[in-house]
Amino acid sequence: MKTLPFNLVVNPVSFGQVSTAILRELKERKQDIILSPIANQFDLSAQPENPEFQEWLQEAIDGFTSKHSRKNRVFKLWHLNGSLESFSDEQVLFSFYELDNPTREEINIVKNNYKVIFSCKETVEKFQSLGCKNVDYLPLGFDSHNFYKTNKQYFTDDRITFTIVGKFESRKNHEKMVKAWLKKFGNNRKYSLQCAMWNPFLKPEQNNQIAQGLMGGQNYFNVVFSGYMPKNEMYNDYLNSSDIVLGMSGGEGWGLPEFQSACLGKHAVLLNASAYKDWANDKNAVLVEPSGKRDVYDGMFFHEGQPYNQGQIYDFNEDDFISGCEEAIKRVESSRNNSEGEKLKDKFTYSKMVDSIVSHM
């Protein structure tokens, strides 16, 4: 068995969570690897303690500089911005792209990698249409190590609980979702809304201001904003406490929180666009059709005229969204468990994902 080199970020946010799941699968296979952490980020604090896994990773890190040859392909998981740089003459890059107008810089980066893999078919088709013949599709898997049913009772009444998950940003249409939900269901004891939109790239006071702004200066007894969750165990508990997850993002590379929730048997209301389409259907989710597109620029994470992250995202009609919520309520009233959603965890696995990764190396 040959030694496989990896260039990954190991941290608590989405890129790091995916990287860690890949590494864990490789260890279970007893695959010999060497690892160079991107930006020297090596933070397993969100993961359950596992000294053996951490020791295995540290050995892989310690061996990278002495064992690696640029003649060997390296698997890298990172943004397009920063992926022209590589440790290999033939880099295999896995990246996420959520918009619709690749810049000349982004196109050039893709073309200069040996292989670029995206977890969204729409993204693959976009880059192929722009002359990138080296792109491929690979879906993510369900992280069964961190996410599982707790079988706890979280509430003493029969409320139906909605959740919105994912760091706050304009691209995810969070503001429009929350305000539409409040207009329809705010201060209704039959329903509650849990928002886990803490953005670790913003200051705590900025996150608090966002929450206050979404409430429009009013008080709603059936809405809760959660703070940062430093442990995946807490995050798993949060997902388990919900009945319906809401995902109306205008552009997604996969939609991890919504996907994990559906795999746990939670009902979902999703925008039928971008990567949601690659795993959601009308059996495992309530699908809302996009109403069109809008510019992504928000003056915070997306700035017009820059060499990266340019274009538009999908939008939705508020009435269509509320209709989707009402349909999801009916599904919950029929059964709290989304059995079709649970099937996703067997269809999309990290075992299958790593099979594909290894085949490219």
Question: Where in this protein do the model-derived segments appear?
Answer:
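N-terminal pre-catalytic "stem/leader" segment of glycosyltransferase-like enzymes
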Residues: M1-K71
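Conserved donor-binding/catalytic core segment of Leloir-type glycosyltransferases
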Residues: L4, Y154-K172, V178-W181, L193-C195
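Extended catalytic core of nucleotide-activated donor transferases of GT-like folds
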Residues: F42-F127, E233-M234
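Acidic anion/phosphate-binding donor-loop and adjacent secondary structure
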Residues: R104-E105, F142-R159
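Nucleotide-activated donor-binding/catalytic signature segment of Leloir-type glycosyltransferases, i.e.
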Residues: E205-E233
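Aromatic "clamp/platform" in nucleotide-sugar-dependent glycosyltransferases that forms part
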Residues: G250
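Short hydrophobic beta-strand element within catalytic cores of glycosyltransferases
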Residues: H267-L270, V286-V288
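A charged, aromatic-enriched C-terminal amphipathic alpha-helix characteristic of glycosyltransferases
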Residues: Q312-S323, K330-S359
